[in-house]
């Protein structure tokens, strides 16, 4: 959903454009932002549409979305086209490992019901090397990788070296 990081980024002083292909999701995000006193430019659009319109941004955030898009290459190509020269993109996604199957599918969907069943298809998760290869084909490179871990005991996320479940990639144009 478009508001995953849009509201926190706006609160930190960024000028935010939040997009989602779903008009319904954008409506929910707009209502929440307005109730919070935030003026976020939410649009029911795709990255491909924004790139075709010639839009450019200092930072592009693709958070927990690449494992859901129909055409990964087209999506990443559009995201790269949206980056201004010297800009960056952050991609957050799930690695395709036995650990990610255990935590994201069995744990989050089946046992804990944090997500609706079928939200994820493990076969669509991307190994960091696969993401890097897709980005290279689009004139970009992964500058840094960092793992993301969630602790249910503290209800907090932490960054680290373990890429086995969730990870983020800092992407720059090559």
List each language-model region with its residue ranges.
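Class I S-adenosyl-L-methionine
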Residues: 148-158
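Acceptor-substrate binding/catalytic loop of class I
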Residues: 93, 110-130
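Short low-complexity, flexible loop/linker segments enriched in glycine and/or proline
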Residues: 32-38, 106-107, 157-161
């Amino acid at each position: 959903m478009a508001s995953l990081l849009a509201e926190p980024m706006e609160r930190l002083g960024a000028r935010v454009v939040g997009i989602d292909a779903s008009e319904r999701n954008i409506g929910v995000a707009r209502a929440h932002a307005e109730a919070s006193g935030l003026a976020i430019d939410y649009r029911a659009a795709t990255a491909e549409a924004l790139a075709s319109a010639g839009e450019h941004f200092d930072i592009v955030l693709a958070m927990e979305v690449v494992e859901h898009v129909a055409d990964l290459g087209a999506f990443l190509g559009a995201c790269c086209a949206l980056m201004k020269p010297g800009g960056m993109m952050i991609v957050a996604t799930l690695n395709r490992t036995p650990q990610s199957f255990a935590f994201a599918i069995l744990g989050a969907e089946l046992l804990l019901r944090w997500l609706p069943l079928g939200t994820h298809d493990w076969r669509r998760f991307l190994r960091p090397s696969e993401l890097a290869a897709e980005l290279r084909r689009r004139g970009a490179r992964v500058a840094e990788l960092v793992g993301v871990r969630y602790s249910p005991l503290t209800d907090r996320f932490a960054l680290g070296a373990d890429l086995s479940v969730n990870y983020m990639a800092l992407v720059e144009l090559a």
